Amino acid sequence: MGQSHLDIGVGTGYYPAKSLKAGAKCTEITLLDLSPNSLQATEQRILETVGREAVRVNTVVASALEPLPFDKAKKFNSISVFFLLHCMPGTPEEKCKLFDVVRPHLAEDGVLVGTTVLGQGVPINWLGQKMMNSYNNNTKSFHNSEDNKAQFDEGLRRNFEEVDSWIMGQVMLFKARKPRQQDAITNVVPKDNLD
């Protein structure tokens, strides 16, 4: 976690709170999520973990698939996207828009890290498959039946010069550095134009 950090899809705030408690040198953390409740709970968790004097916390209600509501010059030393992509509706190509919108806000020497649960191309036992079907079809808490490593790698490589990704079980972990300077070319079509 860098001095200035952006956490997207904050969930319960477990990861930033754990990093700060372990001694991360972060002095400013920006939390971005669609849920004001998640943002409030995460901010509270962080402040209870390290104290208001240790880190400045900013909260932003916004979509990770739209241009981020920051000045173009705003850069973060690190950006995290933990266990978010598999919860986002849309195709893998549409989800890769996230990499397009975070790239301009990652410092030249910064790092993007993340994880997601894949729906294709990874081994899964019958119980895991049953749970995945339930999460995707019954509870609608997952939207990852088409998600695969190759397409996420492509989206990352389109935006970053250095990409490292690997699989642990059914989870893809990734790390990306050196944001490309030119605008990323994306094949994402806005949902309004799908007819």
UniProtKB/Swiss-Prot annotation:
CDD domains in the record: AdoMet_MTases
Cystines in this chain: none
Biological processes annotated in GO: methylation
The keyword ATP-binding belongs to this UniProt entry's keyword annotation: no
Gene3D superfamilies: Vaccinia Virus protein VP39
InterPro entries associated with the record: Methyltransf_12 (IPR013217), SAM-dependent_MTases_sf (IPR029063)
Pathway: Secondary metabolite biosynthesis
UniProt GO MF annotations: methyltransferase activity
Alphabetized UniProt keyword annotations: Methyltransferase, Transferase
EC code(s) of this entry: 2.1.1.-
Database matches in Pfam families: Methyltransf_12 (PF08242)
Sections of the chain in a coiled coil: none
Main function: O-methyltransferase; part of the gene cluster that mediates the biosynthesis of pyrophen and campyrone B, which represent a class of fungal amino acid-derived alpha-pyrone natural products. The first step of pyrophen biosynthesis is catalyzed by the PKS-NRPS hybrid synthetase ATPKS that uptakes and condensates L-phenylalanine and malonyl-CoA in order to produce desmethyldesacetylpyrophen.
Family label: Belongs to the methyltransferase superfamily.
Protein name: O-methyltransferase
Species of the source: Aspergillus niger (strain ATCC 1015 / CBS 113.46 / FGSC A1144 / LSHB Ac4 / NCTC 3858a / NRRL 328 / USDA 3528.7)
